Amino acid sequence: MFVLSGYEYLLVFLIVCSLLPILALGASALLAPKRRGSLRRSTYESGMEPFGQAWIQFNIRYYMFALVFVIFDVETVFLYPWAVAFHRLGLLAFVEALIFIAILVVGLVYAWRKGALEWS
């Protein structure tokens, strides 16, 4: 019988994760049509003929909303494992999570007061 230890599973996982993208790119290169021309080098805009410049300046408000979203998305990533193991972690972990949430609330209040969340 073939039995793997914990590290051997990790090695197999890393090998498979390395080979899958290589195989996908190789299959794409082999199966893709080999047409060359100006149409292939043009930009793609939702199936429509491109118009105007491809490089435009975005309003800074988009970046502010994206930054606030990323901050609270990362908060979710950190708090989910804590919530899953909450009953085993004890009071110290609860206090640490409250401090973490308080720091994020202070950041949210700061962004709100500075007008980063208002579009007008």
From Swiss-Prot:
Its EC number is 7.1.1.-. It catalyses: a plastoquinone + NADH + (n+1) H(+)(in) = a plastoquinol + NAD(+) + n H(+)(out); a plastoquinone + NADPH + (n+1) H(+)(in) = a plastoquinol + NADP(+) + n H(+)(out). Keywords: Membrane, NAD, NADP, Plastoquinone, Quinone, Thylakoid, Translocase, Transmembrane, Transmembrane helix, Transport. It is found in: Cellular thylakoid membrane. The chain crosses the membrane at residues 10-30, 64-84, 89-109. This is NAD(P)H-quinone oxidoreductase subunit 3. It is a multi-pass membrane protein. GO terms for molecular function: NADH dehydrogenase (ubiquinone) activity; quinone binding. InterPro entries: NAD(P)H_OxRDtase_bac/plastid, NADH_UbQ/plastoQ_OxRdtase_su3, NDAH_ubi_oxred_su3_sf. NDH-1 can be composed of about 15 different subunits; different subcomplexes with different compositions have been identified which probably have different functions. Belongs to the complex I subunit 3 family. NDH-1 shuttles electrons from an unknown electron donor, via FMN and iron-sulfur (Fe-S) centers, to quinones in the respiratory and/or the photosynthetic chain. The immediate electron acceptor for the enzyme in this species is believed to be plastoquinone. Couples the redox reaction to proton translocation, and thus conserves the redox energy in a proton gradient. Cyanobacterial NDH-1 also plays a role in inorganic carbon-concentration. GO terms for biological process: photosynthesis, light reaction. One of its GO terms (cellular component) is plasma membrane-derived thylakoid membrane.
